[in-house]
Regions:
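A beta-strand-loop signature enriched in Asp, Gly, Thr, and Trp
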Residues: 265-270, 274-319
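N-terminal signal-anchor module of multipass membrane proteins
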Residues: 1-105, 384-385
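Hydrophobic, membrane-inserted alpha-helices
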Residues: 111-116, 131-140, 155-162, 246-254, ...
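C-terminal ends of transmembrane helices
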Residues: 42-48, 112-123, 160-170, 249-257, ...
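Loop-to-transmembrane alpha-helix initiation sites
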Residues: 152, 173-178, 292-299, 322, ...
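Membrane-interface helix-loop-helix junctions at boundaries between adjacent transmembrane segments
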Residues: 126-205
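Long hydrophobic alpha-helical segments that form multi-pass transmembrane helix bundles
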Residues: 170-248
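Structural signature of hydrophobic alpha-helical transmembrane segments
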Residues: 94-110, 145-154, 230-244, 289-301
């Protein structure tokens, strides 16, 4: 490591103040920070000695995403091969999935990081590690055969509008990854819905049936998958959203490390379950009659409530606010699924909606606490007098 440190120090000289490449220092600083812990410290304000910085927090989330990502690779190949009736092995499925998914990840990182670097140089501030997670999340929540140019445009929109327009990492109101998906959904709806977008190379296969479970229910069809299949994720869907089992592995890591809020996750499940049970009692259509516990297993609910709703920037910040925020995400997710037949998956819109209301929730939670303390103080003052 000492050898690498010395080489980096040699490369650093042209980028320091007064050097020929001074304006590109933020880009070099990002490279240096990726290799070593930053050597700068705060000069004023509160000082907290902690071994966890933004980079390590982002890496923790990426590690939590890996199980769902690798299963997504397998499921991509699995869904393709079972439609073609070609004999295949586990490794055949994984290789096909990797062949389809890795270019999407590469495009997402290349385009997104290029914009991040450009803004860092323009604003003369360090490149933050926030996009490390966003750049992986975006391709994981997209259909497998989404054209790469379309993915690139969605990334550009998300980074510019949902992130940089608000000031960059830590300042965004909306979740950037979900903003990218929302843009793609409304700008290119034919590539985001239907029975041809969820299975790799579906347009080249005659008679394919790749409709998602929620899409089938929205059309009053019968579901051909068991709850076990839904839980494990061997069903059509977005790249890495289908397996609840592997999402829960990531959720466990986020909870243990304290990176993800278990309050938001649990309250989201409670909210969705309550509304799902009420609709089961009503049972007016296929989506209402769909078992409440299966609502938790299909679509992007598990992935969204674990990795999207818990975004520490766009989610509620107060303890009570997290319970309210998560509960309402679950409630609106099921409501949108049931009452919006044109878009049976509701978790994306539910989370984005609650992102907008998260500051308001925190505001009233804080105001409520201040009011309670004021009344308590006034009561204590009266007793002493």
């Amino acid at each position: 490591m000492d050898f690498i440190r010395k080489q980096v120090d040699v490369l650093k000289k042209p980028f320091t103040k007064g050097g020929k490449l001074e304006k590109l220092y933020p880009a070099f600083n990002a490279f240096e920070t990726m290799l070593f812990v930053p050597d700068h410290t705060t000069s004023k304000g509160s000082h907290i000695r902690d071994g966890v910085d933004l980079k390590r927090t982002m890496i923790t989330v990426i590690i939590a995403l890996v199980p769902a990502l690798f299963y997504g690779m397998y499921n991509t190949g699995y869904q393709y091969y079972i439609q073609t009736n070609i004999e295949f092995t586990f490794f055949d499925a994984v290789l096909h999935g990797a062949y389809k998914i890795f270019p999407m990840i590469a495009v997402s990182y290349a385009v997104g990081l290029a914009i991040e670097f450009a803004f860092a140089v323009y604003r003369n501030h360090p490149v933050n590690e926030g996009y490390l997670v966003t750049g992986l999340l975006i391709p994981m929540i997209m259909p497998i055969d989404m054209p790469l140019w379309m993915l690139a445009i969605s990334v550009i929109f998300a980074v510019l509008i949902a992130k940089e327009a608000f000031g960059g990492t830590g300042m965004n109101i909306l979740n950037p990854a979900l903003t990218a998906r929302a843009f793609a959904f409304f700008a290119y709806p034919t590539f985001m819905t239907g029975d041809k977008v969820w299975v790799s190379e579906a347009t080249n296969i005659d008679g394919i049936s790749g409709e998602t479970i929620l899409g089938t229910l929205a059309a009053n069809g019968e579901v051909a998958y068991s709850s076990a299949s839904m839980f494990m994720g061997s069903i059509p869907g977005s790249v890495a959203e289908t397996s609840v089992f592997f999402v829960l592995i990531g959720a466990l890591l986020l909870i243990i490390t304290g990176v993800g809020s278990w309050r938001i996750m649990l309250s989201g499940v409670i909210g969705a379950s309550v509304v799902g049970i009420l609709f089961n009692l009503w049972g007016a259509n296929s989506l209402m009659s769909f078992e409440w516990y299966n609502h938790l297993l299909v679509g992007g609910f598990a992935f969204g409530i674990v990795f999207m709703a818990t975004d520490p920037v766009s989610a509620a910040q107060t303890t009570k606010g997290k319970w309210i925020y998560g509960f309402l995400v679950g409630v609106f997710c099921i409501l949108i699924r049931v009452f919006n037949p044109a878009y049976p998956e509701g978790v994306m819109l539910a989370i984005l909606l609650m992102n907008v209301f998260a500051p308001l929730i925190d505001h009233y939670v804080i105001e409520s606490n201040v009011s309670m303390r004021r009344k308590r103080w006034q009561g204590a003052k009266l007793e002493t007098t």
